[in-house]
Structures are given as structure tokens and as C-alpha cells.
Amino acid sequence: MDISFVKTPAIQDLLDRVAGTTSDKGDPRVKAILRDLVESLMVLIVKHDIDENEVWGAVNFLQNGAGEFGLLMPGVGLEHFLDLYMDAKDAEAGKSGGTPRTIEGPLYVEGAPLVENDANLTDDPDDTDTLYMAGRVTGPDGEPVTNAILHVWHANSKGFYSHFDPTGEQTPFNNRRRIRLGDDGRYAFHSKMPNGYSVPPGGASDRLMQVLGRHGNRPAHVHFFIEAPGYRQLTTQINFGDDPFAADDFAFGTREGLLPVPNRQGDTAHIAFDFQLQRADDPEEEAFSHRARLAVA
């Protein structure tokens, strides 16, 4: 059987009723999206001759792996696709330049301490090298961005993030800060060197990667949000260019221009990295995306 089966009157009538298109109640946009989504799933079932057991196996996988959706989204490339799609829309609108955006990941925590420049991020003992990172935040014409707040977070040397550490050993907001920048747009911080991590062994993401013949590893990296009045909010991260997984990030977070190589000297490592923001055309562009994030009082 071919996918023309999905276009038969009986199936098309079913889709109309599923999406509520026969009713003038509800949200027309949601109806259209749901209809296309369900129809696409039907096409997949017919195209690949997916049987009943496989369908319910997929449902069980999603139910049991719901706690790892934040890892599955980047793992199957959807979070990176959103970045590429937004880049394409920017190009279509004539917007260009600025530090590349890349995936946020699932491990941001709201409410990190707000500190002044030259901040220490690490509260807990960690037997590893010290990272020093500094640079400038500028606008599209090279002007220093004033009143900016740089959010920064990363893992510890074991690859664990505070608030998500399965060992429970990290104090709240370890390796997490919001840094208020001065009028010169300069930032600086130091912390203990992060390490990369892998998805939880035996979890939904790990099982899917094994079925696909892929690994679930991320290189060592540091996450950033940057917000400032009059500029587009930036979500990005740097992957350490000398990490063996920098060119093969399971989450597809590696992007050209975001791969600095730390200058390692004894027990310290230094990264100089400048960020460039785009101007906002409206206040909505200054705001964060509306995804759910962990908030800690």
C-alpha cells in the first residue's frame, strides 16, 4: 500500500473531525497544525509499514522518556533546526551579523546570583584547572553595549550541573551567575574548568542513540544568555575547540565562530571571546523565548 491511502475520502474526513475543522469553535491555527501533524504521522505509518506493536512501542518510549525531552529535542536535531530556521528567517528579512545563536539546552536555572564584573562562578571545591574568560559585548557597529546582563552556566569537572547533579554534591547555583556589565561592555569571570557529559546511561536518550548507532556525548562547553535594552536577546554557547567531541556534538550545538581553543598554561586556561548583539526592532526581540525553565526561589 502506498501513501495515497492517506488521501482517501475516509481518512481525510477523519482528519477533519480529529482537528475540529468542522466546528467554528477553537483556535484555527492549532487546528491546522494538529491536522498536518496527525496526517504526517499517518503518512509515516503507511510509508514505512509500521505495525501496531511498533506504534505502541513508540508511545511507551515517549511516555517513559518524558523526563528527557529536553535532551531528546537536541539529540534528534530539532533544537538545532530551530536555530537554522530562525537564521533563515533573519536572512530573508535582511538581518545579518552578530554572534551565532545556538541551542540553549535543558539545564538553565532561573534566579542565579546577580553579581558585578570579574565574577567567580564556582562555589564548590573542584580539583581541576581554573578557567579565565573575558571579552566585550558590542552592538552591530562595534559600540559597547551598556546595561547588559550576561547569564553564564556550565558543568563541573564531572560533567554535572548544579540543581541537576545526581550525586547531590553541588551547592545551589554552583557555576551559575548573572553578571552585570559596565558601560564599556566588558565582562570577565573565572571558574573551575567544566567537562563534557553524556546522556544518562540507560535512559531514553541513551537507548535512542544506541538504536541509531550514535553516541550521546557533548564536548566541554559554556552557556550564555545576553540581554540588554535595545538589543536582541542572544542565546548561545561556546564549545571548547580542543575537545574530542567538539566536531561531533550529539546535540548539534557546535557552530562556526563558537569554537575557541582554551590557552592552557599550567593549571589555568584562558579564553578571550567577544559577543556581538543585533539591534532589536521591537521589545519582543529583547525577551527570552517562552520555554519552561527551572526556577529556584
Summary of predicted features, one role per range:
Residues 2-297:
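Beta-strand-dominated extracellular/periplasmic modules and repeats
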